[in-house]
From Swiss-Prot:
Component of the RIX1 complex, composed of IPI1, RIX1/IPI2 and IPI3 in a 1:2:2 stoichiometry. The complex interacts (via RIX1) with MDN1 (via its hexameric AAA ATPase ring) and the pre-60S ribosome particles. GO terms for biological process: rRNA processing. One of its GO terms (cellular component) is nucleus. Residues 611-635 have a biased composition (Basic and acidic residues). The keyword Heme does not apply. The gene is RIX1. Component of the RIX1 complex required for processing of ITS2 sequences from 35S pre-rRNA and the nucleoplasmic transit of the pre-60S ribosomal subunits. Regulates pre-60S association of the critical remodeling factor MDN1. This is Pre-rRNA-processing protein RIX1. It is found in: Nucleus. InterPro entries: ARM-type_fold, RIX1_N. It comes from Scheffersomyces stipitis (strain ATCC 58785 / CBS 6054 / NBRC 10063 / NRRL Y-11545) (Yeast). It holds the Pfam family RIX1.
Length: 724
């Protein structure tokens, strides 16, 4: 619903009762601003600016949003852009903690919107944006602590598009962002805020005056050196020498020199064994440094850089290799609490490493394929084993880690169309199947074990068994005691299975287990849930099971078609569409070719008419001729007619086709025509014509004569007899 401009101006005289209809009208009805007169335009802008100057927070917020809407009109932005910028900058400068935060966020968003509208237009950028840009950057940095997420994102965009103007503020912004990293609660910040801080720090090398790529490379190597120094602390708790490859991997990473220790981003750690919680500083430090390194190598830059993928993968391999299942604790670490904390820190480090590897696959895609075998090997180390079997209890305890593990493997499998070696994936398949198995609650399992143990002891008195009823429920309705599997785990496992069956030929054991799980889940989702809908991941998994049957001798198509009856892809298998028969279509290129074809058809019709005319004439004269003459004349025209018809038929059937004017839909085998010749027997000598009277028996047709006699009547000279 649109409001007339006069009513809009009237509403803006004072405090509008509701700004939503005004915003909707000015935003959707473009004709109002496109056809506005100069006087109405001035009234509209002045009244909106009066709202932004109002001390009332609602009016200030309404005026700020109205500025954002009217800036879509180029005429208003060109004529009043400087005034609009000035009022927004004043509101930003006067903001304090007593004002509602909505005023600050709407002001920053309006300024960013105006910058985006002006950016790229040389004259407006020079006259309006450039003079205000330094003031905007200064105010953003001063108000950073009020709304860090939106302001940091705004600063990152200004660094990207105006690196030269931002150069004087680079060191100040870097110091502010590193202050956030030093906070103890930084790891508890929201993920969008942490990601914005990491990416803004990674974009700062762009403001360098010369050789920004060298500054970027120096920052990346400094982060790798700092990560190495943090990971080396585990040598105080674990015997890293148990793994012979770990010392070699540490040697491959660069180290800080004596004069470079001040280049560290984070301060030194203080770990006290008497305070076991201080050990968590290791995983916190690894989390920050690894995510910052991730931002450097995955965030796009305006200049070319040389990414040290080899060193990055070595860092991740060291993190995954520091595993307490394969590396023993040192003898002086006897406190069980410290041991558990050290184990927890290694799990957290592995989780961050898996996320990093997944981001590398998304960013560099095919460039990661040469390292695929190495990556799968280091991920395989994270699968929990006990007595040569997967430890189910540990698997469930570290469910988040194993879920991310399968997700990372799925991403790397999506980079290839086929993988010949399936041995590295068998453990991951077993992990996925175990994660989606029905889970019995611990209390139920413990109660069941206690009952078994009590039955195996001494005989008790025959008192009433108080545990019979709950035990009977467990035996008869076990599915009601199963623990619900997280939806995120189910979706990731389904995606992983879909990626596996489409890229790898698994052994029969694992393949049949996957097929069994697929069918059970499909039937359950189709008939035993309230909505009777198949989830997207399960639908994709069912279709891939049909397309890639593996060792199945019997197709899953009938079962899957029953469950997914509306799928268009499966309908192709159930109702195959055969291709049409090849048809020759003449391709008329121009009018001259079309006219030539018409002329050929006319000539052909004319020839047929010429052939038919003598036949019609003979048919008229046949009744007047004697039988002997008729018999002789019937013989000759028939031979000529048969030859001509044969030639016409051959031209129609065996005409050579020009490939440039004919479209072939399918190759066909060339058929050679069988030539058949009609031999007409002619007498070797023709006797002299003798006048003979007509005989009734000679009227029999030669063609109907079955004895095939060689006798032929001589020609009768009818004309001569008539003249006489």
């Amino acid at each position: 619903m649109s409001i007339p401009l006069s009513l809009v101006l009237k509403q803006l005289e004072g405090s509008p009762s509701s700004v939503v209809p005004l915003l909707s009208t000015l935003y959707y009805d473009k004709s109002i601003l496109n056809n506005i007169s100069k006087s109405d335009s001035k009234h509209l802008v002045s009244r909106i600016l009066n709202l932004t100057r109002s001390p009332i927070e609602y009016n200030k917020w309404a005026g700020t949003n109205l500025i954002r809407v009217i800036s879509d009109n180029y005429t208003i932005l060109a004529t009043e852009g400087s005034n609009l910028f000035g009022e927004l900058v004043k509101n930003l400068d006067s903001y304090n903690d007593t004002v509602n935060i909505k005023v600050l966020t709407s002001t920053v968003e309006a300024l960013n919107y105006l910058c985006d509208k002006i950016r790229g237009k040389p004259t407006m950028t020079r006259e309006i944006l450039t003079p205000k840009l330094s003031t905007i950057i200064t105010l953003y940095m001063d108000k950073l602590h009020f709304s860090p997420l939106i302001i940091i994102k705004s600063l990152k965009k200004l660094i990207q598009f105006h690196p030269t103007t931002f150069r004087p503020f680079g060191n100040k912004l870097r110091a502010k962002l590193i202050t956030f990293l030093h906070l103890q609660d930084f790891v508890n910040f929201p993920e969008p805020l942490k990601s914005a801080i990491y990416q803004t720090l990674a974009s700062l090398p762009a403001i360098e005056k010369t050789e920004p790529e060298l500054k970027w490379e120096s920052d990346v190597k400094s982060l790798i050196k700092e990560l190495k120094s943090v990971l080396a602390i585990y040598n105080e708790f674990l015997n890293l020498g148990d793994d012979s490859s770990l010392p070699r991997l540490f040697e491959q990473l660069p180290s800080f020199e004596e004069n470079q220790k001040n280049d560290k981003i984070l301060p030194d750690m203080v770990i006290d064994v008497n305070e076991p919680s201080s050990v968590f500083q290791i995983s916190t430090r690894v989390d920050i440094l690894l995510n910052l390194l991730n931002a450097y190598v995955t965030y796009a830059t305006q200049f070319s850089v040389k990414v040290p993928l080899g060193l990055v993968l070595v860092v991740n391999e060291i993190i995954c290799s520091i595993n307490v299942r394969y590396i023993s604790y040192k003898n002086d670490v006897r406190d069980e609490q410290i041991r558990k904390i050290v184990k927890s820190t290694t799990v957290l480090n592995s989780l961050n490493s898996i996320k990093f590897l997944k981001d590398l696959a998304f960013t560099y895609k095919g460039s990661m394929l040469p390292h695929l075998g190495n990556i799968l090997s280091l991920l395989e180390v994270l699968v929990p084993f006990k007595n040569k079997k997967i430890d189910y209890d540990e698997l469930i305890i570290q469910e988040v880690l194993n879920r991310e593990l399968l997700s990372c493997v799925s991403v790397y499998l999506s980079l290839v169309s086929f993988l010949s070696d399936h041995t590295q994936l068998l453990r991951f398949v077993d992990v996925g199947l175990l994660l989606v198995e029905p889970r019995i609650t611990d209390s139920t399992a413990q109660q069941n074990n206690n009952n078994h143990n009590s039955n195996g002891g001494k005989k008790h008195k025959k008192n009433k068994n108080t545990t019979a009823i709950p035990l009977s429920d467990i035996l008869s309705h076990q599915h009601l005691f199963n623990e619900a599997i997280p939806e995120a785990t189910v979706n990731i496992v389904r995606q992983f299975m879909s990626a596996v069956i489409t890229t790898v030929t698994l052994p029969p054991t694992q393949h049949y287990k996957i097929m069994r799980y697929i069918l059970i889940q499909a039937v359950h989702s189709r008939y035993y849930n309230n909505e009777h809908l198949i989830p997207r991941e399960l639908r994709s998994l069912l279709i891939n099971a049909v397309l890639y049957p593996g060792y199945e001798k019997i197709s899953l198509l009938p079962i899957v078609s029953t469950i997914l009856g509306d799928d268009p892809l499966l309908s192709v298998f159930n109702n195959p569409r055969f291709p049409p028969l090849p048809i020759y279509v003449k391709n008329v290129k121009d009018e001259s070719v079309f006219e030539e074809e018409e002329e050929e058809e006319e000539e052909h019709e004319q020839e047929e008419k010429e052939i038919e005319l003598p036949e019609q004439k003979r048919a008229i004269d046949e009744d007047e001729l004697p039988e002997a003459k008729k018999r002789k004349m019937e013989d000759e025209p028939q031979v000529i007619q048969q030859e001509q018809i044969e030639q016409v038929v051959e031209d129609k059937i065996f005409t050579k086709v020009n490939p440039e004017t004919v479209v072939h839909f399918a190759p066909t085998k060339e058929v050679e025509p069988e030539s058949r010749t009609i031999q007409n027997q002619k007498p070797e000598t023709v006797p002299e014509p003798v006048p003979v009277a007509p005989v009734q028996q000679m009227s029999q047709n030669i063609n109907g004569d079955e004895d095939e006699s060689d006798f032929e009547m001589p020609e009768i000279d009818v004309d001569d007899s008539d003249e006489e």
